Amino acid sequence: MKIFFLLIIALVSSWLKANEKPNIIIILTDDLGWGDVSYHGGYIPTPNIDQLAQDGMEMNRFYANPVCSPTRASLLTGLHIFNHGVVRPFMNPSAEQTGMPPELKIMPQYLKEAGYQTALSGKWHLGMANEKFLPTNRGFETSYGHLTGGIGYFDHTAAGRLD
């Protein structure tokens, strides 16, 4: 009888373990060189990032575009630049394209459907001229950072206004 209960406990615990969702952390940086992190031989210690790379999965062959907005759109949609239509950074709110097309479903929307909590920290740069482009309307429950391509480090302004 003890063996039967131990077997049941083992099966249930392995089933529960198999149903645990892994944590997903994506770090996307602009202009980060291969050797800028210490686990790739960089001179500046990056122990926390090194630990994440050691314990997690490093995907280091993601090629999309040499500028930020198309790269972010490719990562979030899983589409090539010519399929998602974001071909340049969103710099001018009066330009013909002011944000990533809202009809494109992106990674945080899928993750929310799968029961994940989603958050964005840092640079969005996929549209800010209309509320439909904002990260909190694209699947991120929380967004802490800035919407434009770059801000002042000390005053958090872009183009003379707070971002």
Mark where each language-model region is.
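Sec-dependent N-terminal signal peptides
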Residues: I3-V12
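Formylglycine-dependent sulfatase
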Residues: K2, L16-D163
